[in-house]
From Swiss-Prot:
The gene is pdxH. One of its GO terms (biological process) is pyridoxine biosynthetic process. It comes from Bordetella avium (strain 197N). HAMAP family: PdxH (MF_01629). This is Pyridoxine/pyridoxamine 5'-phosphate oxidase. Its EC number is 1.4.3.5. FMN binds at residues 60-65, 75-76, 81-82, 104, 139-140, 182, 192. The keyword S-adenosyl-L-methionine does not apply. Keywords: Flavoprotein, FMN, Oxidoreductase, Pyridoxine biosynthesis.
Length: 210
């Protein structure tokens, strides 16, 4: 089936060097705030791309739970496919796509686990059903729906309303080494600004051809 006639003109914004923030995390924070103001559904949803030990890539949507100058934090099962990938190869890439604003942000970097205290704090902020779910799900392993629901009942009976954080579950932080901000423009002459480390604890910005 051909879908070659599906196209639209991007005309909702511009991205100029003189208007961009000096640091990529400040530019990201600005765009994130604007995505929230525009009521973009789940603006913290991102594609996380990882690569396993054999070089096979995989990608999935996950939600960031924090971002700051240190990087971008998300939580998951350590034994999931992405967890196994990151154990073998800690390099990963993130992609945020805010269609309503005709914007995307690409981020590359190295992923590290956050501290146990940070994982505990976030885990205990979650709804109890989600905390039970972290125990019930042997993420990425084959299972029937009936068996999954049976595991949920078992862990509800075991922990009640106070499940502890499972040892196989916690947080990761992607420490960025590369940012690219993309703003759709007419005639496919999009704006692309790239930030890279300058070797002096700062960042250098330049424009890429669309």
């Amino acid at each position: 089936m051909s879908v070659s006639d599906l196209r639209q003109s991007y005309e909702r914004g511009v991205l100029l060097e003189q208007q961009a923030a000096a640091t990529p995390i400040d530019q990201f924070a600005l765009w994130f705030d604007e995505a929230q103001a525009a009521q973009v559904p789940e603006p913290n949803a991102m594609t996380l791309a990882t690569v396993d030990a054999s070089g096979q890539p995989s990608a999935r949507i996950v939600l960031i739970k924090a971002f700051d100058a240190r990087g971008f934090t998300f939580f998951t099962n350590y034994t999931s496919r992405k967890g196994e990938d990151l154990l073998a190869n800690p390099r990963a890439a993130l992609l945020f796509f805010w269609q309503a604003l005709e914007r995307q942000v690409r981020i590359e970097g190295v992923v590290e686990r956050v501290s146990a205290d940070e994982s505990d704090a976030y885990f205990h902020s979650r709804p109890v059903g989600s905390r039970i779910g972290a125990w019930a799900s042997e993420q990425s392993q084959p299972i029937t729906r009936e068996a999954l629901e049976a595991r949920e009942r078992d862990f509800k009976a075991r922990f009640g309303d106070t499940p502890p954080r499972p040892p196989h579950w916690g947080g990761y932080r992607l420490v960025p080494t590369y940012f690219e901000f993309w703003q759709g423009r007419p005639s496919r002459l999009h704006d692309r600004l790239r930030y890279r480390p300058d070797g002096k604890q700062g960042w250098v910005m330049d424009r890429l051809s669309p």
